[in-house]
UniProtKB/Swiss-Prot annotation:
Residues 162-231 form the DRBM domain. Mg(2+) binds at E50, D123, E126. HAMAP family: RNase_III. It is found in: Cytoplasm. It comes from Allorhizobium ampelinum (strain ATCC BAA-846 / DSM 112012 / S4) (Agrobacterium vitis (strain S4)). This is Ribonuclease 3. The lineage of its organism: Bacteria, Pseudomonadati, Pseudomonadota, Alphaproteobacteria, Hyphomicrobiales. One of its GO terms (biological process) is regulation of gene expression. CDD domains: DSRM_RNAse_III_family, RIBOc. Its cofactor is Mg(2+).
Amino acid sequence: MKAPKALTAEEREKVEAVIGYHFIGKERLDKALTHSSARPAKGSDYERLEFLGDRVLGLCVAEHLFKVFRAATEGELSVRLNQLVSAETCAAVADEIQLHRYIRTGADVKKLTDKNMLNVRADVVESLIAAIYLDAGLEAARAFVLKFWAERASRQDAGRRDAKTELQEWAHAKFAVTPVYRVADRSGPDHDPSFTVTVEIGKLEPETGIDRSKRAAEQAAATRLLEREGVWTRSTASD
């Protein structure tokens, strides 16, 4: 397989502008955005960087939570940390940055399932964090993380449990039934899909969630139903 083309100078500038960091070693940005389906036999891709970025992200978020939520217990901090470093949150950051426009992939990426497409977007964010860390150190990586995670950490719903788990337990306790999720619509290209999912519980009015992955849309639908039924307090933070 031929090595994928490097990002153009214009593409690099667009990515650097939105992330708020300008790379010293431009090749690090290229490596961070190269999916395994596009790599040459001995080339580098973001999977190794993702391994490192996952650890850097966890440290930066844990440190931030420790400083901000001084009265929180270890268990409460862990719930927030797990949510903030989850694939869903990382993928949401990727969507905010619109990294899907710049990830270099091969034809095989079209065969990925919806869940794996979410993981692709999540992993590339972690690889980007690692690339910044290797390029300029922990302070630069921390600045990037805080730019995109600090507000998320402060949201009212940041310490919530997983919405689907919460909804399932509530439905079992109140109605002795299991929530049913259905994909009502899928639109958009393979690299940037949009899913509309409905969730039904017995005779209750269904709720709908829309997101760029089936999994995230299910979470959105579950969240809306929990808030509508008063199980959760509606978050006043904007998404």
